[in-house]
């Protein structure tokens, strides 16, 4: 796989607070190689390592996107949710940013059935079919549709399992990560100093609590995906 230059600048990472980890009491000893210092009880991530693994991740998603692969971005905590949705929409990726429903990938048949129900209800609403039902029944259908939109809206166009899953915050999205491991779906995971770097295929050590840090990482990955898609279009 050819390496490319992704303009990952250390000063910009510092401005985004990418280097700030968790308190020294909340850490995983496996993260020791990725920590450069202890500042006032806070672990500081080695940004050289961060840049290296972020660059590797960008190379991976670029080549995958140029080959027409499908991506799923997962980040459900409040600080990540909006950034995940914007990044995914920009790169035409699927996303989950509200709640990970257990078995979303490992029980794909059930998820596919829910998605079909979601699409059917959306079509009924668009064509005015809800107006044909009694008010009480229509209200129930609208609530059900709203619930499906909340939890499945980001994957409504997903026809099968994703080729690569990008996860924001390993601790928060552990269930999603385990499902990917079970199904052998490649993962890129943003990990803080309290995480296990051995679980994902590529782990990017970075601050997973600051919005600016999350956006910085996502922006680089999304740019690489968009570049890969553009290359695919040019070569077709």
From Swiss-Prot:
InterPro entries: Ribosomal_uS2 (IPR001865), Ribosomal_uS2_bac/mit/plastid (IPR005706), Ribosomal_uS2_CS (IPR018130), Ribosomal_uS2_flav_dom_sf (IPR023591). GO terms for biological process: translation. The keyword Chloroplast applies. Pfam families: Ribosomal_S2. GO terms for cellular component: chloroplast; mitochondrial small ribosomal subunit. HAMAP family: Ribosomal_uS2_B (MF_00291_B). Belongs to the universal ribosomal protein uS2 family. This is Small ribosomal subunit protein uS2c. The gene is rps2.
């Amino acid at each position: 796989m050819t390496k490319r230059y992704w303009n990952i600048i250390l000063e910009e990472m510092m401005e985004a607070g990418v280097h700030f980890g968790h308190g020294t009491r909340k850490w995983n000893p496996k993260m020791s190689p990725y920590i450069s210092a202890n500042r006032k009880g806070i672990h500081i991530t080695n940004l050289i390592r961060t840049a290296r693994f972020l660059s590797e991740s960008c190379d991976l998603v670029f080549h995958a996107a140029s080959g027409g692969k499908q991506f799923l971005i997962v980040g459900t905590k409040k600080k990540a949710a909006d950034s995940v949705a914007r990044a995914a929409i920009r790169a035409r990726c699927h996303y989950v940013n509200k709640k990970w429903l257990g078995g979303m990938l490992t029980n794909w048949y059930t998820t596919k059935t829910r998605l079909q129900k979601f699409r059917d209800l959306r079509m009924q609403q668009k064509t005015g079919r809800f107006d044909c039902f009694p008010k009480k029944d229509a209200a129930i259908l609208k609530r059900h549709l709203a619930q499906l939109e909340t939890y499945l809206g980001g994957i409504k166009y997903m026809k099968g399992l994703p080729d690569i899953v990008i996860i924001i915050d390993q601790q928060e999205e552990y269930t999603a990560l385990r499902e990917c491991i079970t199904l052998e779906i490649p993962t890129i995971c943003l990990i803080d100093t309290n995480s296990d770097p051995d679980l994902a295929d590529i782990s990017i050590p970075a601050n997973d609590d600051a919005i600016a840090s999350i956006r910085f990482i996502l922006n680089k990955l999304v740019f690489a995906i968009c570049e890969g898609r553009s290359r695919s279009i040019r070569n077709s």
